[in-house]
Amino acid sequence: MAIIGLSLAAALGGDAAVGAASMLAAFTVPEFNILAVLSFTVFSDDKSAGIEKLKGVVKKIAKNPLIIGIFAGMLALLLRELQQKLFGEVVFSLQRDLKFLYTSLGNLKSVTTPFALVVLGGQFTFAAVKDYRKEILGGVLFRIVLSPLIGIGAAIALSALTGIVSFGTDAYPGLIALFGSPVAVSSAIMASQMDGDEQLATQLVVWSSVCSIFTIFITACILMATGHLPM
């Protein structure tokens, strides 16, 4: 969601859709990572109990790079707002005052996901598909078929049948990004770090990425045909 999802939202709906998708990412990325850490901890072989296990969970959540990045970004935004209130303008801006560093970080950001996919591709083995075929089929179907069907379907139903929530065309690219994006590249890294099944996680990332090319296209076409996405 944080990387592929925002690019997908931009392609489907432009700047307005990116704004909505960014708001979704700000809440869902920390939530998903916290739930992932909890899941790995609950189903791990760690025999710790009580306070010790709770401390371990909190420590792993606090050390998660994506969660740290989200809260660091929020802190930077708060500091920017504080500067404007205190001085009437932004006194220091990374983009303005350290342009070389800002440009370098931007270039680095653009290669992170492709590089991670290349690394995962190097670890991918077709022989493992035979051992994990049921898990791969179930995981991929749930992630890129059932998840968007339930999530986006619920959004359409809420908008059409109730007056509680109304989703505009700017919201649906973000919802496609949230519910229809493939398994995150970082999940394989997290599985390795937390003694999970790294090979299965790698298989899910690769196969969901390949299959999502078709499911996202079909989803976008259906929503365009029904007027939920701009043509």
Name each model feature, range by range.
Residues 1-231:
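Alpha-helical transmembrane segments of multi-pass small-molecule/ion transporters
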